[in-house]
Amino acid sequence: MFSLIFLILIGVTAVCDAQELVLHLSFDELNGKVAKDISEFGNDATFKGNPKLIEGVFGKALEFDGKTSGQIPDHASLDIVEAITIEFWAIVGGGEAIQSGVEKGTAWISGLYNLAALYNGGTILQFFDLPDGCNDENIGPSIQDGEWHFLAGTWDGDDILLYIDGKLEADMPCKGELKPNNDPLFIGARGGSGRFLTGALDEIKVYNYALTKDELLKDMAEPVSLRVDAQEKLTTVWARLKAN
């Protein structure tokens, strides 16, 4: 019995310590109202409302009608405390003044991290546990224009960086320490009950470390298989989006 507990503890520690992709929702298919996580951790998202697949940047994407949201149960892989990257492609239309993208927590509590697709006229990556100025002042430009944009935020333990379409748009020194919480991770709404997204999301990814700009550009170009020729791939992606 002791050996089994010891092995479980080792496994949990490994999940927390290794640099990993801990969530990847491609939205290429739905099984009922469940979107499969294609990372190794199986953090599948269950949606309520009217989840609908549409044409995305890569394959299919999930449309959000201002009433739809997804929920992923708490898991050790999502209790990120040392560094993080959250990224997704998003279309943001009308609707609420604050529209959630990916948020761990049901309310503004310890352990919450949030990459908001729309935040008071802009975009933001925020954390409850970091110093006050880091929570709501590092706001990037708005992407509320009905077009696809690649939004990514990183925190490496010292600085929050916010990228839009591969360009660094906001940065702020934010040294601190995150704490885990036991809440689910929500997609497209805070706690599944407010700040609903009106638009669409594609290729949601969460890493438990901070990606470099070059690594983000590779994800933009080809999110499943990262390749060296990222700039060439990006040119093709933007040409296809403009053609549509």
List where the protein language model places each region.
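Classical eukaryotic N-terminal signal peptides for Sec-dependent ER targeting/secretion
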Residues: 1-3
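Extracytoplasmic low-complexity segments
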Residues: 5-67, 217-244
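Flexible glycan-contacting loops in extracellular carbohydrate-active proteins
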Residues: 172-200
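Beta-strand-rich interaction surfaces with strong enrichment in secreted/lumenal proteins
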Residues: 73-76, 138-142, 174-175
